[in-house]
């Protein structure tokens, strides 16, 4: 068996279980639907966030956005 025929293996980001990266694995990179839903719930409750730079509202200058009201 050659390396080309072995599927890549990753760890489930939720529980750490070993997961083969195959087209048949409908939950990849997760090991199960349960882990996939746990991850979705963490995004929905904002446990995970994508960092962004806050932008001033339209029409505000940067100085106005920084001043307390």
Curated annotation (Swiss-Prot):
GO terms for biological process: regulation of DNA-templated transcription. Zn(2+) binds at residues 12, 15, 31, 35. Residues 49-69 are annotated as: Disordered. It comes from the Bacteria. InterPro entries: DNA_gyrase_inhibitor_YacG (IPR005584), Znf_NHR/GATA (IPR013088). Its cofactor is Zn(2+). GO terms for molecular function: DNA topoisomerase type II (double strand cut, ATP-hydrolyzing) inhibitor activity; zinc ion binding. Binds 1 zinc ion. Keywords: Metal-binding, Zinc. Belongs to the DNA gyrase inhibitor YacG family. Inhibits all the catalytic activities of DNA gyrase by preventing its interaction with DNA. Acts by binding directly to the C-terminal domain of GyrB, which probably disrupts DNA binding by the gyrase. Interacts with GyrB. This is DNA gyrase inhibitor YacG. It comes from Thiobacillus denitrificans (strain ATCC 25259 / T1).
């Amino acid at each position: 068996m050659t390396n080309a025929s072995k599927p890549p293996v990753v760890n489930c980001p939720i529980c750490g279980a070993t997961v083969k990266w195959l087209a048949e694995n409908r939950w990849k990179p997760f090991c199960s639907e349960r882990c996939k839903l746990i991850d979705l719930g963490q995004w929905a409750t904002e446990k995970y966030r994508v960092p962004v730079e806050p932008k001033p509202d339209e029409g505000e200058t940067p100085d106005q956005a920084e001043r307390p009201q």
